[in-house]
């Protein structure tokens, strides 16, 4: 299914893009947030994503909004260096997009087509009017069996958002110690049967290497029974492994902290999360900036005292939005 950006209206209402503004879409994906921001004001968007497959969506957006959007293939935790022209490693310029798209689609990577930003005149730090994050895995990634994110599609055990990384889901299930597997599945997936699952994984890999998503899902299902639950027994395990492979919580912590440091006066930071681990990180960080005892209390203000959730209408149209939570802060000085 196509990726539908969640809480889109709510994000725009909080961000309130202005003509002449500069905004960062830290999780570009299919470009839904970037497109909405560009449509709502005569502004510029710097988009970030570590997944090179999103370039095709950037290409379409750049045709419609030439010179108003740039895509950086990077981790959003590096947002400060991305906006610092002296240390940026990769920049996708409009002139390079077609060439890069064809190379990526053929499965060949050539570093020399990535253009250095050492003299691109990229906006320096502390000069953006807003940063938005839509955290987690996208529908496009889940639906592509070759990416190995989902137990609904058979494919290699991968789960990397950045396929240049050397650590993938196969590393997790075939190389980690039983205790590490159990602790990760418990801490990142909230799976109370984590030790049983870890033992089953280790026993299975003694017989042969676990290679596919279906193999792993069936191993989990063999020791965890669904009963009356509508949730597949493999759901929490797959979530935990994906978070581990991509260091999602570490990236989120570093990303939102860095984003808060590059905002102009009145600049806004908006984060949409999809599970409690992510939301807790955002809530705790925002509170640390905005509570009276914080030295940053007079610098930041919460835009909404409680998180914003999707309406019943949106949930009916896009079930993925059911667990989405939006939190936002504004820089005051």
From Swiss-Prot:
| Enzyme Commission number(s) of this protein | 2.1.1.199
Organism domain of life = Bacteria
The record's listing under Pfam families reads: Methyltransf_5
Please list the reactions this protein catalyses.
cytidine(1402) in 16S rRNA + S-adenosyl-L-methionine = N(4)-methylcytidine(1402) in 16S rRNA + S-adenosyl-L-homocysteine + H(+)
Q: Name one GO biological process term.
A: rRNA base methylation
UniProt GO molecular function:
rRNA (cytosine-N4-)-methyltransferase activity
Gene Ontology CC annotation, any one: cytoplasm
Which NCBIfam families does this UniProt record tie to the protein? 16S rRNA (cytosine(1402)-N(4))-methyltransferase RsmH
Q: Could you tell me what this protein does? A: Specifically methylates the N4 position of cytidine in position 1402 (C1402) of 16S rRNA.
Query: Belongs to which family?
Result: Belongs to the methyltransferase superfamily. RsmH family.
Q: What is the name of the protein in this document?
A: Ribosomal RNA small subunit methyltransferase H
From which organism does this entry originate? Wolbachia sp. subsp. Brugia malayi (strain TRS)
Gene name tied to this protein: rsmH
